[in-house]
Amino acid sequence: MEVENRPYPYMVSDANLLQQIKESSAEGLFKSFSLLLGKDVRESGVKFEALLGVYTNATQFVKFLETSLAVSCVNTEFKDLKRMTDGKIQFKINVPTIAHGDGRRPQKQKQFIIMKATNKHHIGAEIELSTQDLELLFLSKETPLDVTEYVGAVKTITSALQFGIDALERGLIDTVLTVKLRHAPPLFILKTLADPTYTERGLKKNVKSDLISMFKTHLVNNSFFLDKSEHLPHSRQYVLGILTEMIGAVCKETVFKGISTYSTANGQPISGVLETTDKVMRKLVNVIGQADNSIMGPAAYANYVVRGENLVTAISYGKAMRNFDHFMSKLVDNPTSNLDNDAVDTFESTGSIQKTPISTSVVMVGNKLIALESLQRMYNETQLPYPLNRRMHYTYYFPVGLHLPSPKYSTSMSVKGTENVLHQSVEAWIVNKNNTLQCFNYQNALKSICHPRMNSPILCARALGEAFPDVHNLNIYGIRSEDAHTMNLYQIVYDYYDNKHVAHVHSLAQKSMMTHEEVLHPTNHEILRTEVHPFFDVYAERHQGAAVQYRATHRNLSGNLPPPLAPYSFQECRGYQFEVASGLNHVIDSTTMEIIQETAFDPAYPLLCYIVESMIHGQEEKFVMNIPLIALCIQTYWNNSGRLAFINSFYMLKFICTHMGNGHISKDAYSCYRKIYGELIAIEQSLYRLAGHENVANENIGQLINAILDKDLLPPFAYNDIFTNLLRKSSRHPVVKIGMEEYDDDNDQQNCINIREKMEDLVGNMVNIYQQRNNTDHSRRYVLDVGELQENTYNSVLEKIFYYVLLPVCTNGHVCGMGVDFENVALTLTYNGPVFASAVNQDADILDHLENGTLRDVLVASEIRPTVGMIRRLCTSFLTCPFITQAARIKTDRDPGQNIVTHTDGKYVHQTVLVNGFAAFAIADKSRDAAHCLFYPVPFNKLYCDPMVAATLHPIVAEFITEIPSQRNAVVFNLPPRLIAEYEEWHKSPMSSYVSTCSQTPLSLSTMIAMHLKLSPVSFICQSRHKIHPGFALTAVRTDEVVAEHIMYSSKASTSVFIGQPTVHRKEVRSDAVVFDINHELASLDTALGYSSTIVPAHAAAITTDMGIHCQDLFAMFPSEAYSNQQLNEYIKQKIGSDRVYGMPLRDPREYMGGNRRVTLPGLSHGQLATCEVIMTPVTADITYFQSSNSPRGRASCVVSCDAYNNESAEKFLYDHSLPDPCYEFRSTINPWASQIGSLGDVFFNSQHRQMAGPTLYSPCKQFFNKEAILKNNKLFYTLVTEYVNRLTGAPATSNTDFQYVVINGTDVFLEQPCQFLQEAYPTLSASHRALLDEYMSHKTTHAPVHVNQYLVEEVAPMKRLLKVGNKTVY
């Protein structure tokens, strides 16, 4: 049949199937070409455009009526829509009341006046028709070939027309869907705000707080419900429950009442429509079943096609309306009228409009029939994103290296083999998106924690100065040492403690004496204020006439971390790790260490031992001379008490082991000395094994790893010229301050150092020595008297291990520096008749010949009976003894990894070396009178300043600690500033605090060695390689992206769509074609009395990031920043894998731009790398904090309960640590290094410091630290909650009320980036030990969140993953 013989569309009287409209309209259009235009289509373009407009009117909304989306819409013709600029419709709603019979006053009638605003939309399409094809339509068809060409032209033009018309049809659907989404808040918002428990209480602070809590709960519980249902025993009931909540959360009241547009075949109304994706639709049908496969929709559209001029159909509750005026008269002015009775007026003598079946899925939810539809295919065909597919961003966090406090316990009955309480975790096991177990450890984080910016206090100090310019009660004690104008140590000590009635306790000591709970309590916020950086001690000072300035000095050693943030049990775990990593096998045992402790606390320790030690003063020749006396002292004391004499001196220990192994003393005693010395050697070898053999920056790498191996740290006691040796070998510009003189050049040795040679070489110089001893003012003689250093046998490492590790640990710090009055000692020994009386036999017991005096009292108290010859030889040793005990103040540059400072003095580290002094134990009461004449206390080092020992050496110290009893603790004991200033020292209060409480076990020695590991990048590299904890934990933060498939519910007839007249005009006329633009004006009006739609994530289609362990490379982000030593900088970058790109010039501009200089990986295995950033965190951070959603800052950031426009109040909420954390009222924070103003985390991620420290690349942490963004989000959140509550609480409205039930600004961010909005990250599945994760993956009903010192954190997030390892799955 020829095409022209088909019936014309405008002669058709009726059509029941919607699809027939397109076919009939298209066929009739071609006949109209010849009737109206003739052969040349370009001659009558206006008529053709009008005809094309008629065609588009006739076919535009057919496909829309076939969709289930139309269930929720009402369509109305509005020819003058293009003239409308601001369309509004006002509705009056009467509020019903309840009449009470208890005498209450009747309520007045209330009326809501709701103003509904329309929103205009524009859709357009382009149609291109070939001129040649149009001309073929009018050629005579004389041959079969002509007919074939004619049919081909018809098909071509039909295809072009179909393309344009389909675009308009899809445009309408897309517009309506977009309008619906604009009126569809997330379910977790509507569900919360619809709860009368909250809405009836008013919008107070406590109510807002409750609302936020419920937002969080519903967000986690309701999101991705289809995924969660797959692993629930009653999945169908769970899914139906969520769908029921969606239906119940929306408003079912509209301005139209009573009649349903769409229904089932048996007449049951369709209550609404669920729009979703193909996959979600299939899953829903599979889970809850399908109640029907079609619905009955209006078919009246065809009737209007044949009526000529009225080509736009307005469908409202199954009826067609002529125009907008008719809409106003019937639905607005008289909305309760029965439209069925008005059918004659409406349709001009036409009865009820006909309906046609439309194929769609219908599900039964409760007692309601809901249409279920997916429009995804339409978007897939057009290669456009589907609005119900959204990208969600969730930020996860997990801890690395936390230490669980005692008592240890376990919640597992199956995990075995990890019961060792000393096993400290240095890693976190996580599961990535492909269920691959991955280990995040400190080696992953080296690219961040080794960067210069992480090791800099400059920004912290600057931010503190800006935030706290006024500081009351400034502390000056311990900040800076004073120059000693005298070499007389006795005078220095006496002047300091004489008439001293006030004790100062700086924050270092205060923190060392506090518990973890105390230091984080809001009442201690002033102490906590300066705890802003794990590597630095910060203090405030004010110079005369200047403002307050904040300074920072490096903590040097991991043992100097405050005990509340790095407790002793944790340090012992590090000691155990050191043993394992270095292969240390202790030679010493607990019994020997207890003997040393008993010796230190022995009130009967022989005073004669100190006299002998002072006469020998570290000189081997004098030791050899006096071996018989020394052996007598050792053996007598061992026999009397079972304790060890001379154990307070390294040189005495060394000489005893060297020269007294041939029977001078008992085998048992000698064995103890050998064990002690053997322990020193074992520790030394373990240190070298740990450090390795590399050289960095012209230094052995061990110097940058452990302070014991650092040649710039000298032993605390010196008897030989170790100072010149330091000047010759150190590259850190050491300066030896000798009183008022500075010795910084080894060429000045003769002016600053007096080398006392061996006695046999000084026979001819004895007179000069005697004259110098008696005629010189030694208080003003700035020269050190020391022996010659034997460099080939000198081993400072063994000496430092003894003085800084073994002796403090074994004595519990019950030891103090002691000065000697050599003149009085000599008088005590020599001014006795038997000593040099030739009549007395040298083998005679001297006590048999001594008269009453100091020496007799000393010998009697010591219970030692030397011979006359022994005392004579001891007196001979005095001939070349030093004149006085002296002190030298050593200043050196810090190592190149620790020299980023806030002020010039901070570049230096200081220590005091006691020259020809000794370490003393407490003096017994019976010996004190004699001791006070011979010795005096010199508290010069935090490990050698026990006030109880010092009090036994001089009554002035005893008076001081008696008057101020708190000063009896070595941690807080005030020390002379001419000898020590704690902020400048190598050893600080935390190490003193540890030794005072540690047990006498070999582990304590390992712990003290581990505490000497440096807080420096090279040390971190070494420790991470050997799995030794660096002293601080990490909070790893990662943002992952999820493609989520949503489901939207919309109630019936909740949106009115106004359709204007289409406009067709020629866009372009060419010789080969004519291009037409078809534009259509649309407007939408929400007709519901509340929110009629809601949306919820139903299924996670894909996780686009790997959820892995890739850590941020700060060397790539800030390539221009480097350590001052270039060799060190290159070494660090090479070791951590952040080298410069090969072949790129050092000064290439790309080096300073950050983003383009890195070489990307050749390929990816698990998808886009999700970058982890690390926040330094105290190891004592509460593990329960990480088991729920919280701010990675360590303190709550969401301040929506505050006044939205009171920034001061909001900032106090964020940063004022005198206020408790609103989420955890018993503390201010869990991480002072990140939550406080000026803390490392704050200055690093806060955009306020962007010009100096804000990462220029992607930073998942920035959203939690950027103050401006936080306050902005909080205001937005406040507004969001307020706006939603105003719309849903039913507050009376006025004629000025213009509440539009639309999605409030920020809702999309809330839904898609909830972590940014709520300022919280979600915990991801992680475990400190793989065993706990393996148990968790065993899919048992119980698992072990805590096991001794190990922990597991479960994943609590909106998206719940199915985890699978091997054949084991757990959800």
Curated annotation (Swiss-Prot):
InterPro entries: Herpes_MCP, Herpes_MCP_upper_sf
An example molecular function term from Gene Ontology annotations: structural molecule activity
Subcellular location: Virion; Host nucleus
Entry keyword set: Capsid protein, Host nucleus, T=16 icosahedral capsid protein, Virion
UniProt KW Transcription keyword: no
Tagged with keyword Transport: no
Sections of the chain in a coiled coil: none
Top-level taxon: Viruses
One cellular component (GO) term of this entry: host cell nucleus
Annotated function: Self-assembles to form an icosahedral capsid with a T=16 symmetry, about 200 nm in diameter, and consisting of 150 hexons and 12 pentons (total of 162 capsomers). Hexons form the edges and faces of the capsid and are each composed of six MCP molecules. In contrast, one penton is found at each of the 12 vertices. Eleven of the pentons are MCP pentamers, while the last vertex is occupied by the portal complex.
Oligomer and partners: Homomultimer. Makes the hexons and eleven out of twelve pentons. Interacts with triplex proteins 1/TRX1 and 2/TRX2; adjacent capsomers are linked together in groups of three by triplexes, heterotrimeric complexes composed of one molecule of TRX1 and two molecules of TRX2. Interacts with scaffold protein; this interaction allows efficient MCP transport to the host nucleus. Interacts with capsid vertex component 2/CVC2. Interacts with the small capsomere-interacting protein/SCP.
Protein family according to the UniProt entry: Belongs to the herpesviridae major capsid protein family.
Protein name as catalogued: Major capsid protein
